[in-house]
């Protein structure tokens, strides 16, 4: 199933090895190709990560006014009134240049890259059991890779057999992960509405992962079937992610600082959660009425836009 991921990963590694092979020895070239694989993959998804982060911050900045509009929608009585509020919400998004980003895209690239590298290394570790080629790597590439060492240890060996040697890298990877997670938790704390159950639970899950992730990484490195090359990939990948996170946080702080109104909404949500002060919810009948009005209002707006279109072009 994961074989398909081997081809782009092995292709990237082969390209970088070919490019730098003239300047360094064979073993160093393969080690550097792993680092450049990290930079290539993370570099591709960095703009997407920024788009997702920027989109999330803008939605937070819009929250106070957007919340007021949503509350007004719950009390709208006519289609025209609802249409006016929907238009107001659309204008708000335009004023902030809000473009929802596909936050799920980066994992769809980084996870296959990791799985592809894992399959490449694992198959080269057990090459005697199958073909002499792996992905886009031919027999000569595989043989050279298998002879590549890190501090005298073949990078196709399992990391659990060389714990003392790799502990500094594992500890560094865990430190990078912890620092990155702490930054994410602080960012989430400053933007989470704690009186909303879903948002509160997501924040709690992030906090739990802050504790579980380092333990899991340590366990996998010392007990799992992970080659040395994967540990090297981890170390550089988490370092890249931490640097990226710090840069993005600086950009967010300078370009999209949180307003006092946003902070006050968060503080009020914490007070409401602690005091168990729940806002009165709409009844089923009211929800149906509001949803019906929204549907009618959208049709009303589309109809008006279609009528105004030819006139605007003339």
Each language-model region and where it sits:
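Cytosolic, positively charged, low-complexity intrinsically disordered regions immediately flanking transmembrane
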Residues: 243-314
């Amino acid at each position: 199933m994961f074989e398909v991921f081997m081809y782009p990963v092995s292709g990237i590694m082969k390209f970088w090895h070919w490019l730098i092979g003239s300047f360094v020895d064979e073993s160093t070239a393969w080690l550097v190709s792993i680092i450049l694989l990290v930079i290539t993959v993370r570099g591709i998804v960095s703009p997407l990560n920024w788009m997702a982060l920027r989109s999330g911050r803008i939605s937070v900045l819009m929250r106070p006014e957007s919340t007021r509009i949503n509350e007004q929608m719950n009390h709208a009585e006519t289609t025209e009134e609802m249409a006016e509020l929907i238009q107001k919400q659309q204008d708000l998004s335009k004023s902030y240049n809000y473009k929802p980003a596909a936050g799920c895209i980066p994992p769809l690239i980084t996870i296959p890259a990791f799985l592809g590298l894992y399959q490449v290394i694992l198959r080269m570790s057990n090459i005697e059991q199958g073909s002499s080629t792996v992905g886009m790597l031919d027999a000569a590439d595989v043989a050279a890779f298998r002879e590549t060492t890190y501090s005298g240890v073949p990078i196709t060996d399992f990391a659990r057999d060389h714990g003392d040697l790799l502990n500094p890298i594992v500890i560094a990877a865990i430190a990078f992960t912890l620092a990155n997670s702490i930054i994410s938790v602080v960012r989430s704390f400053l933007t989470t509405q704690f009186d909303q159950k879903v948002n509160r639970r997501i924040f709690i899950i992030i906090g739990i992962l802050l504790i579980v992730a380092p333990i899991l990484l340590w366990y996998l490195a010392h007990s799992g079937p992970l080659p040395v090359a994967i540990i090297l990939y981890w170390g550089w990948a988490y370092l890249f992610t931490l640097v990226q996170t710090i840069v993005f946080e600086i950009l967010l702080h300078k370009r999209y600082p949180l307003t006092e109104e946003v902070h006050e909404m968060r503080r009020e949500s914490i007070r409401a959660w602690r005091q168990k002060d729940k806002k009165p919810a709409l009844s089923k009948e009211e929800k149906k009425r509001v949803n019906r009005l929204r549907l009618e209002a959208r049709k009303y707006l589309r109809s008006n836009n279609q009528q105004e279109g030819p006139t605007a072009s003339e």
